[in-house]
């Protein structure tokens, strides 16, 4: 439907640098002229923005931006907590599982360790402003992180690895796949079944080449925006 398309286009605009929190949106008449649709269509599009929690209507004043989606820029590697702090958002974590287990073949292969070598397995839900943003299953070699605790997992793993363990993170390999939430994911993420999610696999390595962490994450696609800055490489002229 056209109002949904307009709502998505407005959402992208509201998440840009052109708008800050508490910015006043253009009026219905101006938006109707811009999109060449009726004011009723614009009203329905704004209703969606209200339902998404991005804007509020103030009687006699207008419609205001009250929340932006989480923006993760990919020009450099930053942890989720670092990103959110820069955006002034509050992040908390609920650790559902934290245990030591023998590495199964698939995980051992990712971390470049021996099969059955001891690893930490953790499952946690990351909340932003009290709403679930991400479910993460994480695997880390015990030999590298002897003192990893529940308290560390409730905070930032990047901070723990670099500041407490003194290991510099060199980079990260990631792959993204769109999926639909099954019953278990829907319950843990507090969304309806078949809600679109982003499945992200992540493999972090140190400056010295050791593999530190392998994670499988599910992020709420309606609450998470990725912005890429990619440079084109040109062959050197002889």
From Swiss-Prot:
GO biological processes: negative regulation of DNA-templated transcription
DNA-binding region: 28-47
Annotated ranges, domain HTH gntR-type: 1-68
Pfam families: GntR, UTRA
Keywords: DNA-binding, Transcription, Transcription regulation
Tagged with keyword Transcription: yes
Keyword Transcription regulation attributed: yes
Molecular function as annotated in GO: DNA binding; DNA-binding transcription factor activity
PANTHER family documented for this protein: MANNOSYL-D-GLYCERATE TRANSPORT/METABOLISM SYSTEM REPRESSOR MNGR-RELATED, MANNOSYL-D-GLYCERATE TRANSPORT_METABOLISM SYSTEM REPRESSOR MNGR-RELATED
Protein name (Swiss-Prot/TrEMBL): Uncharacterized HTH-type transcriptional regulator YidP
Annotated source species: Escherichia coli (strain K12)
Gene encoding the protein: yidP
